[in-house]
Amino acid sequence: MKKKILFIDRDGTLVIEPPIDYQLDSLEKLEFYPRVFRNLGFIRSKLDFEFVMVTNQDGLGTSSFPEDTFWPAHNLMLKTLAGEGITFDDILIDRSFPEDNAPTRKPRTGMLTKYIDNPEYDLAESFVIGDRPTDVELAKNLGCRAIYLQEATDDLKEKGLEEVCALATTDWDQVAEFLFAGERKAEVRRTTKETDIYVSLNLDGNGGCDISTGLGFFDHMLEQIGKHSGMDLTIRVKGDLEVDEHHTIEDTAIALGECIYQALGSKRGIERYGYALPMDDCLCQVCLDFGGRPWLVWDAEFNREKIGEMPTEMFLHFFKSLSDAAKMNLNIKAEGQNEHHKIEGIFKALARALKMALKRDIYHFELPSSKGVL
């Protein structure tokens, strides 16, 4: 079997990068990245990745960064990590300055030639983990993917690197979960005589939404699901709105439910249950269970015929179709005077319940069922 590698940056990834001069040149500056020990130790013990540290240390060995100020902190870092079961198969340090344009300096691959075009290694299934766009660019140059230790990826879009980024997060818990349990992404295309619908989502995203159904208020409601659950959600709908809103709303619910069901995969490690009770002038309660048995309990009344362009009679139908397609039990109750706030509260409560139920625990990676099946 080919070997997989984690090419791991040092400063800003394993340890906090000193904010003033960006040099870890004293023991006093040594501070480890939050939760790196537990998660990198877990990855090292549970998964079959080789660990290769790849770091640029500007001018190491020159008067601007003497060797005797570098090695004490570096060696203590390695000793501390080793004490937690985290060791490296290789440590590669480039000493050049940026203006040198050295072939060995990240994002160039001069230090990594032994891993390139080597039949022993599977670079396509390997990752670069780092906090700078140059780390993502290194992944691109190696032919692997990147785990970007930043929340936003706007700077990657500008450089055309977004496709290389498999995960963007500042949380090592999410890094370990991603590497151990895999991605939870799905795409669904639903085409009928009445509608053509595309849905894609990432359950472990950042709440990014790109939604267009042709019904402005419906778009606004669906955006609440993505935003408040944390999932990345894209929905594109072409429906027969010239006839009626029914098919557009119903088929969107079906496609979204199917997409959630597919992305859930085995359901191992998930919380399974979720509930939320947000307050505005309305009280909205949504409880759900990903137990595999769809059912809807609906206790919400609306007096207006429409909110925006969306018929209120379709609210129940949307959640029934969603429940059936996602194979989840939904119990929804809402009270209040403002019709807009009431349905928006339901969608927000659903999103928060989803966020709770979809959460995974890789340290208790079991099926949440005494029956052994969901």
From Swiss-Prot:
Record: residues binding Mg(2+): 9, 11, 131
PROSITE patterns, A to Z: IGP_DEHYDRATASE_1, IGP_DEHYDRATASE_2
Keyword annotations: Amino-acid biosynthesis, Cytoplasm, Histidine biosynthesis, Hydrolase, Lyase, Magnesium, Metal-binding, Multifunctional enzyme
GO cellular component, one term: cytoplasm
Protein name in UniProt: Histidine biosynthesis bifunctional protein HisB
EC number(s) recorded for this UniProt protein: 3.1.3.15, 4.2.1.19
Subcellular location(s) of the protein: Cytoplasm
Presence of keyword Cell membrane: no
Cofactor note: Binds 2 Mg(2+) ions.
Pathway, per record: Amino-acid biosynthesis; L-histidine biosynthesis; L-histidine from 5-phospho-alpha-D-ribose 1-diphosphate: step 6/9; Amino-acid biosynthesis; L-histidine biosynthesis; L-histidine from 5-phospho-alpha-D-ribose 1-diphosphate: step 8/9
